Structures are given as structure tokens and as C-alpha cells.
Amino acid sequence: MTLSRYAPLLALVATSLFAADSNSSDEALVSRIAFGSCLGQDGMQPIWDQVQRAKPDLFVLLGDNVYADTKDPVELRAAYAKLGAQPGYQRLKKAMPVLATWDDHDYGENDAGAEHPNKEASKQVFLDFFGVPKDSPRRQRDGVYHAEVFGPPGKRVQIILLDTRFNRSPLVFQEDKTDLVDGGRYLPNDDPNATLLGASQWAWFEEQLRVPAQVRIIGSSIEVVDEDSGGEKWANFPLER
């Protein structure tokens, strides 16, 4: 997704949220969740103070958390450092838990997938920035997918964040199209071996869906419902969808 087409996004889920099991990260009641994406790290980010004024219990970043667009992990780390230096982000991080997945521009480059040559280094930079311990099992996964459970027993919410980059098969590009959207006119990939999440992530995802939960929120960095645009979407991998 491109920064020119998407302004910083803030969405709130404000309802009575109840969810899931004994693998709870925090037993404090969660009743309001904020979501964001598409953050240009080089400018002012007043959005963070707007988020805090809404008083969410939890904040979830859904990708393009910085626009690094680089295969160089040093440059990627520098882009994250600019985000980390934002005063509003620092205040928000102290006020509530922050969960995240990535999209293409914080993964490496526009519309990149499994072919990204430095994806493992990008993953470690991502995990470093979001404070994942060096001995965490997440460091060994094939991607940044992650799930957490919040809230007391009987009133728990599970957040599942998918990684639609690390294992994604090549996109199918229709060369003769001139009405380009998000950098290309992509077609469905009907190859039975093509994947969006990869086998390990699918197995993990199935396990997460078995976690007892009254409310389960699944985050994807690319569009789930869209059928018609030429950009990136789950419909590009119909067998996975």
C-alpha cells in the first residue's frame, strides 16, 4: 500500500469485548481498542495525541508502520528510530500495550513477498523495535505473526496478527494493463502451491483459532474483502482465501 493513497489511519473498537483463555498477557479489562497504519516517519505525527484522547486500552499497528522501502537493515533501523523518537508515540507506548504486524514498506519494499533477500534481518529489526525479548520463540518464527490474549477470565479478547509478507508467493502481474493500482494490476494466482501465509503460519493460525475466545480480532495488513482493485489483496490467492 502506498503512503500517497492512505493517510494515517485510526479506527476504534468501542464495545463490550469479551475473550479467551489462560494464555493471558494482561488481565485488565479491555473495552476499547485503537488501530493504526501507514505512518510516514519523517514528518510530524500529531495523530498519537488524538489516539490517547480516545482513551483506548490497547493499540494495534497493522503495517506500514514506517516507510523505509529498503533492503538495508541499517536504513530500516534508522527509519524505526525516527518513529521511536516521536514524542506522541513515546507517550502512547507508556500508556498502553502496543501490538504490531508489518506490511510491505516496513518489510522491505513495495509489494514485496518471500523473495525479499534480507527478510530475516528485517524481522529482527521489527522485533527489536517492538521490544520482543532476544530469547522469545517469536525470534525463530518464519515471520512476525503473533497473538495475545487480554482481559480477565470470561471477559477476554484475543488479538491475532498475521504476516502476509514473509512467506507470500510471487504476485501474478498482467503486463498489458495500463490502469495500474498500487503499482500493478495483479491477477489471481491459481497455482495450488502458491501461498500467502505459508504452511507454518497456517498451522499456528489454526491453533490460535482453537483458543477459547468470546471475541477474536484478526489483523491482516492487506485487504480481505476487496475483489476488484488491481492492488494487493487476499483475492490474489483464492485457494488461500
Q: Where on the chain are the PLM-derived regions?
A:
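Positively charged n-region of N-terminal signal peptides that target proteins for export
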Residues: 1-5
